[in-house]
């Protein structure tokens, strides 16, 4: 069962994590061939071709998110694709600024006159590979902006940051529309391999897409914006990037908060994810059993979740698809990764914890009854 939990949790993580791992593996294979182009000297030399300038752009999500002029702004930062190589091409990275704004309820008697702090927050996004727009939605009304500007840098290779697999999810939907989990996994892997092959054919240097370069990009943005120091906040993969950034730019960091910390050792998060998921389920179950209402309503939700995952592993969920453009066969299949992945993703937000036992019990109940009609909403 630990294997199934690991697979479910890993599948719930973003495509970018796999993309980055495969890209770095590909890059490692050609390391000898790159030595002639390698930058040598001190660490400062790695920024020898950075211009530390930004250009203002209209935010790509304008018209899709509601905000007033002056609340959110966007820009591009030009950086070398691979700072390890002297002849690397330049790429542009997208960043978003969420401007500090005085809260409607500001207690001047207790907190003094409102004034914006000059030490902003840089939020390190997750994945790797999560686009900035999701974080803009999440933080545009967040209390962290009460006195500080917040910056979000879209990691290289995704979104508006020179996406090297644009429209990745739109190609050939029939390939992954299969009824066997193993075939689905093979199709997903083949799509990633095709993405990398196409990127390389267009001259993309995959060796430049890694956590070290991401950390250097964060320093480059800080210097381009003219801040001596800022406050660093990273969650999930952002905690890996945060650890790398601590080593990269210690003098540029005023304070750092890393949440849901993942080891910086390559691959360690996937090796441990099943154990961590199991620990979270155990803690959730313990809390439920200590609450009379929860104990009466959902006393065995963890056992039922695992049984549901086992059932779906043997017999995948099959439903009639609503959108036949996305599911050309007219059918859609779901596997145990979605049964375990739904509560796994829900664990990211503490606000979900009180309802999680009931949610898991309801999800397991659907599987127990073979009542899969609700899954059509995902098609």
For each feature predicted by the language model, list its residue ranges.
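Small-residue-rich helix-loop
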Residues: 368-379
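Bacterial N-terminal signal peptides
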Residues: 7-17
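Positively charged n-region of N-terminal signal peptides that target proteins for export
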Residues: 1-4
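Charge-rich, solvent-exposed alpha-helical interaction surfaces
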Residues: 304, 308-311, 359-362, 377-378
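Long, low-complexity intrinsically disordered segments that are proline/alanine-rich
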Residues: 25-32
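Boundary at the C-terminal end of the N-terminal hydrophobic targeting segment
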Residues: 19-25
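Gly/Pro-rich cap/lid or specificity-loop segments adjacent to the active site
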Residues: 34-338
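P-loop NTPase catalytic cores that bind/hydrolyze ATP
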Residues: 331-364
């Amino acid at each position: 069962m630990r294997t199934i939990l690991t697979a479910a949790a890993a599948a719930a993580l973003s495509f970018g994590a796999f993309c980055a791992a495969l890209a770095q593996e590909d890059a490692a294979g050609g390391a000898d061939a790159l030595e002639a182009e390698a930058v040598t000297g001190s660490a400062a030399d790695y920024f020898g071709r950075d211009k530390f300038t930004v250009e203002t752009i209209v935010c790509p999500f304008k018209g899709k998110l509601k905000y007033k002029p002056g609340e959110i702004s966007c820009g591009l930062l030009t950086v070398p694709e691979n700072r390890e190589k002297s002849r690397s091409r330049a790429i542009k990275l997208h960043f978003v600024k969420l401007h500090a704004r005085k809260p409607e309820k500001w207690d001047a008697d207790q907190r003094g006159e409102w004034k914006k702090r000059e030490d902003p927050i840089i939020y390190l996004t997750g994945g790797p590979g999560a686009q900035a727009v999701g974080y803009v939605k999440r933080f545009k009304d967040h209390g962290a902006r009460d006195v500080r500007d917040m910056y979000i840098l879209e990691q290289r290779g995704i979104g508006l940051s020179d996406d090297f697999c644009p429209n990745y999810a739109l190609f050939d939907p029939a390939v992954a529309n299969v009824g066997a989990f193993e075939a689905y996994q093979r199709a997903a892997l083949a799509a990633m391999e095709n993405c990398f092959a196409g990127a390389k054919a267009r001259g993309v240097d995959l060796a430049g897409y890694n956590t070290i370069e991401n950390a250097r990009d964060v320093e480059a943005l800080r210097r381009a914006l003219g801040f001596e120091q800022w406050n660093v906040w990273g969650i999930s993969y952002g905690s890996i990037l945060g650890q790398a950034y601590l080593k990269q730019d210690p003098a540029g960091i005023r304070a750092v908060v890393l949440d849901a910390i993942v080891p910086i050792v390559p691959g360690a998060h996937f090796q441990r994810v099943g154990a961590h998921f199991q620990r979270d389920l155990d803690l959730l179950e313990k809390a439920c059993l200590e609450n009379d209402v929860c104990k009466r309503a959902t006393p065995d939700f963890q056992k039922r979740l695992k049984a549901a995952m086992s059932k779906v592993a043997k017999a995948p969920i099959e439903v009639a698809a609503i959108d036949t453009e996305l599911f050309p066969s007219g059918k859609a299949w779901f596997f145990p990764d979605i049964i375990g992945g739904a509560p796994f993703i829900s664990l990211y937000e503490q606000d979900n914890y009180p309802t999680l036992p009931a949610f898991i019990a309801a999800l397991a109940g659907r599987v127990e009854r073979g009542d899969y009609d609700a899954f059509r909403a995902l098609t």
